[in-house]
A protein has these predicted regions:
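Acidic/aromatic-lined carbohydrate-recognition and catalytic surfaces
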Residues: 1-82, 86, 99-168
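Hydrophobic residues within beta-strands of alpha/beta enzymes
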Residues: 92-94
């Protein structure tokens, strides 16, 4: 929430960075737009009064999710990668890279039966374990972006990436 991009994005719905983060209107009763849970506990949405909308945070509320459906966000991300590669870094660790894209319809994740609530990297009593995460991560668009990232990395011989992911079908 301290990044300049987010500060600009939250100020209005029509500024140049308005669509750089995942924003959504409240449901008619004022609650978050869907049932998505944060991996670190609680709902994955936080109300932003300046903008009058919720923003998505799959992790901490201080880590709002970039809107990778926006081509400008993808380009800016690749520009940042290029900056560091030009500086001579040997590679990048891609933390939770499968969380870049979300379902554009913001559909509710289906509930998971109690017997299936197994934590992979989180406690099984964390509400995050109570859902199948079909819509808040691991979307098909993610692979297209990773292909673009790989194409950039291939221009730097010897540079490597290490991606960290987890998903329902990861094992």
């Amino acid at each position: 929430v301290d990044h300049e991009w987010f500060k600009e994005s939250r100020e209005s719905r029509d500024n140049p960075k308005a669509d750089w983060y995942v924003w959504a209107d409240a449901r008619p009763d004022g609650t978050p737009p869907n049932n998505w849970m944060s991996l670190f506990g609680g709902v994955a949405w936080r109300w932003e009064p300046r903008r009058g909308q919720y923003y998505l945070h799959n992790f901490l509320s201080s880590q709002p999710d970039l809107n990778f459906h926006n081509p400008e966000v993808q380009a800016a991300t690749l520009d940042n990668v290029k900056f560091w590669l030009d500086k001579g870094v040997d590679g990048l660790r891609l933390d939770a890279i499968n969380f870049c894209f979300h379902d554009l319809q913001l559909r509710d994740n289906p509930p998971k039966p109690e017997a299936m609530r197994v934590g992979r990297g989180f406690s099984p009593d964390n509400p995050y374990a109570f859902q199948y995460h079909h819509y808040n991560n691991t979307q098909p668009e993610n692979l297209v972006f990773l292909q673009d990232l790989r194409a950039l990395m291939d221009k730097y011989p010897g540079a490597t990436t290490l991606g960290e992911i987890s998903s329902e079908d990861s094992l």
